[in-house]
Amino acid sequence: MMPGPFELIIILVIVLLLFGGKRLKDIGGDLGNAIKGFKKAMKESTDSINNKDDIVEAKIIKKEIKQEK
């Protein structure tokens, strides 16, 4: 069950009182940087896997060309 708008406002006020505006801004920035870093790592991982697949495919094609000669 999702909290309603009134409950979300109360939670936001409590969090703001606990951490303060500057600290909350820092936490948001850190969270944004963490998400950006995670997405970058996922993309690099995918690129690496695709690169390895390309190398394997090139080796297979090279073998096929040798067999045709």
Curated annotation (Swiss-Prot):
The keyword Metal-binding does not apply. Keywords: Cell inner membrane, Cell membrane, Membrane, Protein transport, Translocation, Transmembrane, Transmembrane helix, Transport. GO terms for biological process: protein transport by the Tat complex. GO terms for cellular component: TAT protein transport complex. InterPro entries: TatA/B/E, TatA/E. The chain crosses the membrane at residues 1-21. It holds the Pfam family TatA_B_E. The Tat system comprises two distinct complexes: a TatABC complex, containing multiple copies of TatA, TatB and TatC subunits, and a separate TatA complex, containing only TatA subunits. Substrates initially bind to the TatABC complex, which probably triggers association of the separate TatA complex to form the active translocon. This is Sec-independent protein translocase protein TatA. It comes from Vesicomyosocius okutanii subsp. Calyptogena okutanii (strain HA). The gene is tatA.
